[in-house]
């Protein structure tokens, strides 16, 4: 039977519940347990697919095409277990499910209410499909006290009573702020947060306390006394240099042992931490460094590129180098020469994005990389802009563009439905729904034998995750290839371009998919490992 760990947050948001859940899962895995992590998001959106990156950060896409919270990326990277649609639920999805059931008459005329109908739907989500796991970790989004989170907290309170005794543990993540004027850490915010949680009917078993410095024993005893938690269960969560240091830090503080003890499980033997220690050692003792320019449009919020950042660091791990990131807003290149920004970097990465803003800047970044022989990695939108750049400057199609930006006579990039569906042209209404209208999830691709990208993968058959509405128009394939841009990867039916590259360039690759979503610290994605390797070579030239 699965045991359940419910992780809540208090005082402020963005304390790192997702990292805490992922780190605990990694520690339990290191002891040989089978672990699943689920995220319960209180917002009313059905999923984050149509939310602004500035509001929500990255949308993490799973193999089965779910658009989910970025925390699921942490779960995958720390545990190696692919997430799926059933690992993330939102209030919006819950309400939609309930309304559909009500319309079908499933409730037999009953008045539909938050309790029991909404809470039952949440509980069903938490309990479903856990037969093959020893532990199920459930992260509750938001902060205790938020009105949106109340149904979720009520649901996990009920589960504490309904599950067999000894199979549910509650962890509360809080903040102990340091007040410089007083020269001390303050326990009062945590006390009030726990008081709020207890008023709901949830008594935390473990306090995980974020702080920027060591918490004195006297303050731990104080928290233990006023929050009614064992002193050994007041665990400090100090700031660390990288997220990959967190499992080691939490193990040293005894989090995994305390969780097992709370379940009545002997915490011996110790977990095997070898691979985490190796990752930490490589991060803290690099043998060199490279600088990668990220030419994007959401650079004001780094969480919009969370998986991308981590995948670049993984590429650094594979090559034992530190990866420095130079963030450049693409729009800058529309009014300024890219050269001063790009001539000293060792690689240029143009990530995915939506809309016309910054597109011309990304095209100029691709042009600079092509002409100056600087390693270039174009992902999704970055591949599309590289193809438009080639069409304009190598093929001579001056007005080459994308239908994403408006009507154009030369749609080098467009909705695939605009040129092909069977053999019929299809139009999508510009005012139609955006949600659920993209190519999402894992799709196979066939790579050309002998191409650079096939050599990097070590295979001609791959499967990668997608998230896009627009594709490079296959009608331009022949002209672009004649100009030197090789379409090295296509969908198995030969209809949709998946990868492009310049054979005469040291490293210039564009991919329509998102390889960053499948990179892990212990298994860096081969494209990122190769890109950083090319950047190391470039660093010897500049």
Curated annotation (Swiss-Prot):
Start and end residues of each Glutamine amidotransferase type-1 domain: 291-541
Residue ranges, annotated region (Amidoligase domain): 1-265
Binding site for CTP: 13, 146-148, 186-191, 222
Pathway entry: Pyrimidine metabolism; CTP biosynthesis via de novo pathway; CTP from UDP: step 2/2
InterPro entries found in the cross-reference section: Class_I_gatase-like, CTP_synthase, CTP_synthase_N, GATASE, GATase1_CTP_Synthase, P-loop_NTPase
CDD domains (UniProt xref): CTPS_N, GATase1_CTP_Synthase
Metal-binding among keywords: yes
Activity regulation annotation text: Allosterically activated by GTP, when glutamine is the substrate; GTP has no effect on the reaction when ammonia is the substrate. The allosteric effector GTP functions by stabilizing the protein conformation that binds the tetrahedral intermediate(s) formed during glutamine hydrolysis. Inhibited by the product CTP, via allosteric rather than competitive inhibition.
Active-site feature positions: 380 (nucleophile), 514, 516
Catalytic activity: UTP + L-glutamine + ATP + H2O = CTP + L-glutamate + ADP + phosphate + 2 H(+); L-glutamine + H2O = L-glutamate + NH4(+); UTP + NH4(+) + ATP = CTP + ADP + phosphate + 2 H(+)
Keywords: ATP-binding, Glutamine amidotransferase, Ligase, Magnesium, Metal-binding, Nucleotide-binding, Pyrimidine biosynthesis
Protein EC: 6.3.4.2
Residues the entry annotates as binding L-glutamine: 54, 353, 381-384, 404, 469
UniProt-listed Gene3D superfamilies: 3.40.50.880, P-loop containing nucleotide triphosphate hydrolases (3.40.50.300)
MF-aspect GO terms: ATP binding; CTP synthase activity; glutaminase activity; identical protein binding; metal ion binding
Residues annotated as binding Mg(2+): 71, 139
GO biological process terms held by the UniProt record: 'de novo' CTP biosynthetic process; pyrimidine nucleobase biosynthetic process
Entry function: Catalyzes the ATP-dependent amination of UTP to CTP with either L-glutamine or ammonia as the source of nitrogen. Regulates intracellular CTP levels through interactions with the four ribonucleotide triphosphates.
Anything else known: CTPSs have evolved a hybrid strategy for distinguishing between UTP and CTP. The overlapping regions of the product feedback inhibitory and substrate sites recognize a common feature in both compounds, the triphosphate moiety. To differentiate isosteric substrate and product pyrimidine rings, an additional pocket far from the expected kinase/ligase catalytic site, specifically recognizes the cytosine and ribose portions of the product inhibitor.
Record family assignment: Belongs to the CTP synthase family.
Quaternary data: Homotetramer.
Protein name: CTP synthase
Organism: Brucella anthropi (strain ATCC 49188 / DSM 6882 / CCUG 24695 / JCM 21032 / LMG 3331 / NBRC 15819 / NCTC 12168 / Alc 37)
